Amino acid sequence: FDIKGNSAGDYAWRGRIYYYLGQYDNAQTELKSALDKESVIANLYIAQVYEAQGDPENAEVYYQNYVNSGSADSEAMNALGEIEMAKGNYSGALTYLEQGIAMENVTNRRELMQNLIICYEYTSDFNSAWNIVQEYVQAYPEDASAQREYIFLKNRMEQTAPAENTEEAVTEDTQAVEDTQTPEEAQTLEDTPAQ
């Protein structure tokens, strides 16, 4: 390809093309030149290059630079979330993923939702996972793996719901009994050893 020019945009564009061609060393060279000329988008592109090279530490640095520049988008937030997920830091990942899905222009809603479901499950927030999976299967009914996840979470929610209702009922019954006891009866029950 033949893209001439020495502006930050020219370097960033060439770096992006090299990235797509799998020529990561050339991509880094061009993108570092773009960064030297204060290209914000070059942070995103070079982060993707590092990620493709299996270097999540450097990728995270450049994704974070991109986010800190105020130019963050849902793709960058998802990428940062996935880096945290790979580290096993699911609560940290949720921070990025939730910010990403809350953005005005979300270009990767499906990926964000999939990652949110995973993170909510790993952090034992099954109610949130259930809410997202319901929305997900409505939006993407052809996704067979999401259908299985839906069934799993539905069964989990049904299994935990009766236990919660039973506990509430026992608490309400206990309160009703306590309300009808005289102070002497209540004291007698407290002094009686459990069998």
Region roles according to the model:
Residues 13, 45-48, 79-82, 115, ...:
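Canonical tetratricopeptide repeat
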Residues 35-38, 100-102, 121-144, 151, ...:
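TPR/TPR-like (Sel1-like) alpha-helical repeat modules
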